[in-house]
Amino acid sequence: HTQRLIESGKELGFDLPYSLEELEQATRDTVSAQGYPDAYVRPVAWRGSEMMGVSAQETSINVAIAVWEWPSYFSPEARMHGIRLKTSKWRRPDPQTAPVHAKAAGLYMICTLSKHEAEKNGYQDALMLDYRGYIAEATGANIFFVDEEGTIHTPIADCFLDVDRLLLDSGGR
């Protein structure tokens, strides 16, 4: 996740002011200080407030690491019995319209709107389609299909990048 944060910064046109090792140590220290048995960790980086406007290339780069107690995105019951998904009217953007491989706050808006709409209609999450109309992911979960032979199939990830998918695709568990 830390390497992805660094790469996302580069994709968005800035370098983080800390090394990979410094960020990982800060993450371990922050998680340890909170003492949660299960936690959600979100490192964030953003441009400073020295300039206001579309071009803010001369601003400082800030970094924070937030930690929340978070046992699971879905309840144990939902995880055992499955969740109800509503196909979102919003789609993951075309890679040529947004920096889709960057973990960028602006891209969360699509999932936030989709999740809210699904919940208003009695669903646990939204099924996100890519810009071509193919299944991409849920707003808070990856989508994997297992065929009769036990082969795992994942969506084509050209409009999003997910660490869990990369781990699975590389043979990790």
Per-segment meaning from a language model:
Residues 1-29, 33, 54-173:
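Helix-start/capping segments and mature chain N-termini
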Residues 16, 36-42:
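Ordered, amphipathic secondary-structure segments that act as subunit-interaction surfaces
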Residues 44-48:
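Short loop/turn motifs enriched for small/polar and acidic residues
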Residues 50-52:
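Glycine/charge-rich, flexible interdomain linkers and switch-proximal surface loops
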